[in-house]
Amino acid sequence: MVISVPATSANLGPGFDTLGLALKLHNTFSITPSKLSSIHISGEGEDRPKLRIDNVFIKIFNEILALHNYPMQPFKFSFHNAIPISRGLGSSSAVIVGAIVGAYHIMQKPINKSEILQLALSYENHPDNITPALYGGFNVSMLDSSLKTKEQVINVQALLPTDIKAVVVIPNVAISTKFSRRSLPKKYSTKDAVFNLSHACMLSAAFITHKWELLRVASQDRFHQELRMKNIPALFNVQKIALENGALLSTLSGSGSSFLNICYCDDSGNLAHILQKHFPKFRVIELEFDNIGATLIES
């Protein structure tokens, strides 16, 4: 059995902990019943012994099986990681979603994405990456605690069309979300809060109605982006050059260090070429959007 989960880009500027989308860059997780337990990792992180010794996927997978009183047994795990680790592209969300979906398939339990989403929230308490990893497309997510004893995720998904594409710039610097959040203030002014609220609403409307001309102005942010970009000052130039060369939107991806640029498909090759020329030490990749999310690709 093989599960595929896409990379994700969250925040998208003003949508802090709320907005996210899925990209066609996937981690695959193979799970096979076996006489002996084993783990093999290829791709990103394959040279990190910690990923084998203390593997988060296996930990969550086993916890979900135990939650449903499923008898424990040995498995052969084989993971291929295409999503860069600690680069703001949802590698941790892919692991969480993949582990839960994988456990459901092993138990032959019907895939209830709403139920899986709530389980995933117990491992990552902000849903902006979790929802697109699970559902695909563009997602608006919120946490609601008004009627429940614990917070519930509510999300709305919109499919992304094929006339736009992502050009992602990936610096050779890892930044953890926990570290990145330390640079953020505890309080914001009413003026900045209204600014972000209005821009996040307009950005959501632009994605849902496909009014791409609004992306540039609607993706401005006053909560987190510039503060986080100061950790890697070159990102200010990435954004400037991208917007001067066809990008409709240019924002920090999640907490960084990657930068998400969205452009028309006809402009993606030129934009990628220019960015790679200016930033030869960074990876620059063109990606389509993923509208499927986590899926079983081999039973």
From Swiss-Prot:
Pathway: Amino-acid biosynthesis; L-threonine biosynthesis; L-threonine from L-aspartate: step 4/5. Pfam families: GHMP_kinases_C, GHMP_kinases_N. InterPro entries: GHMP_kinase_C_dom (IPR013750), GHMP_kinase_C_sf (IPR036554), GHMP_kinase_N_dom (IPR006204), GHMP_knse_ATP-bd_CS (IPR006203), Homoserine_kinase (IPR000870), Ribosomal_Su5_D2-typ_SF (IPR020568), Ribsml_uS5_D2-typ_fold_subgr (IPR014721). SUPFAM superfamilies: GHMP Kinase, C-terminal domain, Ribosomal protein S5 domain 2-like. Belongs to the GHMP kinase family. Homoserine kinase subfamily. NCBIfam families: thrB. Catalyzes the ATP-dependent phosphorylation of L-homoserine to L-homoserine phosphate. It comes from Helicobacter hepaticus (strain ATCC 51449 / 3B1). GO terms for cellular component: cytoplasm. ATP binds at residues 84-94. It is an enzyme of class 2 (transferase). Its EC number is 2.7.1.39. One of its GO terms (molecular function) is ATP binding. It is found in: Cytoplasm. PROSITE patterns: GHMP_KINASES_ATP. GO terms for biological process: threonine biosynthetic process. Keywords: Amino-acid biosynthesis, ATP-binding, Cytoplasm, Kinase, Nucleotide-binding, Threonine biosynthesis, Transferase. This is Homoserine kinase. Its main location: cytoplasm. It catalyses: L-homoserine + ATP = O-phospho-L-homoserine + ADP + H(+).
